[in-house]
């Protein structure tokens, strides 16, 4: 998943990658694991053949902001239909779902519970304050994925992400990364 945004060969559309992660919320684990292994093999074949889902030079976008509830994927569709590629997303319906896995080295129940708690305390959601680490994570992710820009999205009723968008914009500006904030809702009227 993380490798989709690396290199010049775009192995999968950003929306396809997001759907794969979102399927993990609800799908049968053995079936999902098999499907992911098949997709990984397909991606490796594409890299070997030099075939990607977007041409070299395509603008690389990092998505951040409000989680995208199934099936609200219009921003990914708009970005990719406009000729960009979403190389990563920083949201709890995307990379936050599997980032910072649970340390499995605990030997006692208390150590195991502490490890689970530690993993969840590392999640940088907009509901936490101060939230400087989320700004650092977004900028670092954009740099790691060689993003050409950050698109920050907030649903109209998601006040926490709306408020935090100012801090995200400031962090992106300080890092020299182009930034765009979009306020939207679940309606399709702004989808073109």
Give, region by region, the residue ranges found by the protein language model.
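Redox- and metal-dependent alpha/beta enzyme cores, enriched for Fe-S-associated oxidoreductases
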Residues: 67-130, 134-137
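Gly/Ser/Thr-rich loops at beta-strand to alpha-helix junctions
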Residues: 65-70, 157-163
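Short N-terminal or domain-adjacent regulatory/targeting segments
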Residues: 23-55, 68-70, 134-135
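Basic- and aromatic-lined ligand-binding clefts that recognize polyanionic substrates
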Residues: 3-4, 47-79
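Single conserved hydrophobic/aromatic residue that forms the stacking wall/gate
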Residues: 1-6, 10
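A short, acidic, amphipathic alpha-helical segment used as a generic capping/interface helix at domain edges
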Residues: 130-146, 163-164
């Amino acid at each position: 998943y993380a490798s989709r945004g690396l290199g010049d060969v775009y192995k999968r559309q950003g929306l396809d990658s997001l759907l794969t992660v979102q399927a993990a919320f609800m799908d049968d684990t053995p079936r999902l694991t098999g499907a992911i292994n098949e997709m990984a093999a397909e991606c490796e074949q594409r890299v070997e053949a030099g075939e990607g889902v977007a041409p070299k030079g395509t603008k690389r976008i990092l998505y951040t902001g409000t989680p995208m509830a199934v099936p609200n994927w219009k921003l990914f569709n708009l970005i990719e239909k406009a000729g960009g590629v979403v190389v990563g997303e920083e949201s709890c319906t995307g990379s936050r779902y599997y980032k910072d896995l649970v340390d499995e080295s605990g030997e006692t129940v208390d150590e195991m519970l502490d490890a689970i708690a530690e993993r969840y305390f590392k999640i940088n959601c907009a509901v936490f304050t101060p939230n400087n680490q989320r700004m650092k994570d977004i900028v670092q992710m954009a740099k790691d994925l060689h993003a050409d820009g950050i698109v920050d999205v907030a649903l109209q009723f998601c006040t926490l992400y709306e408020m935090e968008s100012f801090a995200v914009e400031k962090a992106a500006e300080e890092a020299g990364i182009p930034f765009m904030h979009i306020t939207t809702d679940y309606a399709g009227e702004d989808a073109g």
